[in-house]
């Protein structure tokens, strides 16, 4: 969040905020940009784990406007809460690290950044900022994706990035 705060002066929207270590197919980003909602995130229903990997991930809980929503329907959701956690079964999916902001969404993010003390900014993660926005009453739309993205954490991951 500290690096996002450094870019505050140019954060006007519409824009994408994407983790620097994320590789994904272009259509994930295009779909985010085409969405008219003010705050939109891409979430994979499959939480990526490798073998016995129990490292925390950026996880989200969703609420859906359609009460018959199942993990297999394509309807987008609304972010209910988010956290960096290793309690995988308590969440509905993994945020891939891509956030689309409209002009209004960018203003909301800047407002949230302005409320945070410097010491909290330096320790806070983007997933925490998303949760803060939800707690402030902002609606964060979820677009579900199914694979075709990768967070590069190792040289092995980097070699897999070539497959995207």
PLM regions: where:
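Short phosphate-binding loop-to-helix
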Residues: 1-14
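Structural beta-sheet core signal
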Residues: 17, 41-42, 142
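Conserved core of the sugar-phosphate nucleotidyltransferase
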Residues: 25-116
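Conserved alpha/beta core of the MobA/IspD/sugar-nucleotide pyrophosphorylase nucleotidyltransferase superfamily
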Residues: 90-164
């Amino acid at each position: 969040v500290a690096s996002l705060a450094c870019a505050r002066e140019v954060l006007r929207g519409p824009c994408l905020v994407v983790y620097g270590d994320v590789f994904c197919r272009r259509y994930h980003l295009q779909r985010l940009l085409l969405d008219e909602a003010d705050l939109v995130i891409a979430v994979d229903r499959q939480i990526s784990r490798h073998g016995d990997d129990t490292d925390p991930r950026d996880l989200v809980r969703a609420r859906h406007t359609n009460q018959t929503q199942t993990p297999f329907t394509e309807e987008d959701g609304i972010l209910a809460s988010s956290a960096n956690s290793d309690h995988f079964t308590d969440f509905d999916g993994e945020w891939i690290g891509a956030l689309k902001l409209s002009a209004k969404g960018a203003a909301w993010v800047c407002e949230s950044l302005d409320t945070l003390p410097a010491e909290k900014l330096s320790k806070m993660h983007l997933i925490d900022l998303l949760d803060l926005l939800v707690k402030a009453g902002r609606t964060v739309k979820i677009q579900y994706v199914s694979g075709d993205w990768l967070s590069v954490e190792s040289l092995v991951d980097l070699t897999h990035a070539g497959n995207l």
